[in-house]
Amino acid sequence: MSGGLDVLQMKEEDVLKFLAAGTHLGGTNLDFQMEQYIYKRKSDGIYIINLKRTWEKLLLAARAIVAIENPADVSVISSRNTGQRAVLKFAAATGATPIAGRFTPGTFTNQIQAAFREPRLLVVTDPRADHQPLTEASYVNLPTIALCNTDSPLRYVDIAIPCNNKGAHSVGLMWWMLAREVLRMRGTISREHPWEVMPDLYFYRDPEEIEKEEQAAAEKAVTKEEFQGEWTAPAPEFTAAQPEVADWSEGVQVPSVPIQQFPTEDWSAQPATEDWSAAPTAQATEWVGATTEWS
């Protein structure tokens, strides 16, 4: 498919990307029309996809996309969430029309509805999940390109790109590769220099994982600010005037306070106290008389 040109041959770095993303790993089931793209079967039943055939079909799909004069006439679709971000990134890079999420039935056939479109080329992520746009494309003679796994049905698919269309990394990498080849064939970017866009931007990320990472980053930033604040706080300045003393043993004068003298008395020389036993007796008699009078 590359025509024997060295410039179109698959590079070693591309093979490493495919292997890292698991693009060569298919499923345990095999469709009879996908047998031509299979390299081998593992002992655990997983089929290995021939990456050479994947690269050839990728170049063929890129040539078909470049052949469309108006980039907006190319519709790229992904109903599964693993390919929605990749579809939007591909559309932003190449100028295609994305449909991420649920495909409204009748978009290609019902002229009454507001979402009616007449594209010239259709690219889908999964023929099984995106069966509705493929079926409608067959009604309006629309050529189709699809990322196909080992068990994907090839009905209504004109150009099948064999790859792992289940994994988020594999799907993102395939859309990134397709966008890069389209831009290279258009002459937008050079083949001599690597594309500055990273494949990570095409990968699907779980919203819960993104939220957890944001919370962890926020907590780390707050902790860092508190730590820096403790060490960077200015030291308090003491403005109280300190007495200048040359010799500390002689400089400080302690005022002498006279000790107050209290007169001492001889407690044994005091007169004897009265007889305490007589007074209570008299009082008691008076109280008895008073009580007698009451009775």
UniProtKB/Swiss-Prot annotation:
Species in which this protein is naturally found: Rattus norvegicus (Rat)
Phosphothreonine PTM sites in chain numbering: 97
Localization per Swiss-Prot or TrEMBL: Cell membrane; Cytoplasm; Nucleus
Record-listed N-acetylserine modification sites: 2
Keyword hit for ATP-binding: no
Gene that specifies this protein: Rpsa
In-chain residues carrying the UniProt-annotated modification N6-acetyllysine: 52, 89
CDD domains in the cross-refs: RPS2
UniProt protein name: Small ribosomal subunit protein uS2
GO molecular function, one term: laminin receptor activity
Biological processes, Gene Ontology terms: antiviral innate immune response; cell-cell adhesion; cytoplasmic translation; epithelial cell differentiation; ribosomal small subunit assembly
One of the Pfam families matching this protein, by short name: Ribosomal_S2
Record's miscellaneous remark: This protein appears to have acquired a second function as a laminin receptor specifically in the vertebrate lineage. It is thought that in vertebrates 37/67 kDa laminin receptor acquired a dual function during evolution. It developed from the ribosomal protein SA, playing an essential role in the protein biosynthesis lacking any laminin binding activity, to a cell surface receptor with laminin binding activity.
